[in-house]
Amino acid sequence: MEVKTKQKSGKEHNMEKPELLSGNEKFCLNGIELGFTVRDYWQFQFSNLIDNLGYVAEFLVAKALAKDEPDNCNGWTLFDTQYRGKRIEVKATSYWQSWKEGHEISEQRTFSIRKTHVKYQDTDSKLERQNDIYIFCLDKGKNKESSNPLNLENWTFYVVPTEIINNLFGNQKTLSLNRLTKIEKYGIGITYDIIKETVDNIIDNKLSI
């Protein structure tokens, strides 16, 4: 069985969160500010949002939950964000990929639901899903023009308790979009503006099977 190992979260082993930058910070050489900034770096490396869809989805979910700072320090935490004491894992996919030729799209979309070990120093946990809630995010655009991550009308979100994933899919490593949409109650896609309400209802046991 393939096992993915992740470190404990920063909070669990007292890692300080990195300082949030404004984007106006300048690169320097020998104490002299150069003519380019962190914002320029972002434009150079990350402005192709469709190829960085996972990060965009994590950001959108965090903002929907009224969180201004990331919980996931450089990808080394057990989960992507934390809300009301619950660990939330965000997964994203899209029909259109920038590397696909022409107008070819991927109709069969899947999300990773792989179980992992927590390994930190001499501690090694059992193989399990290290979160309480999944939020699966789909960019519905099927070409370059319609696949715009900035337009939140293009997105559909599925909020599913990890307990449901465990009960229905056991040790499966991936979950297809088709199977996701057939999960009773939780397989109904929602819009961005009700993510927080849906998560609150799950935490408060107002949504259950």
Where are each of the predicted segments found?
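Nucleic-acid endonuclease domains
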Residues: 1-86, 91-209
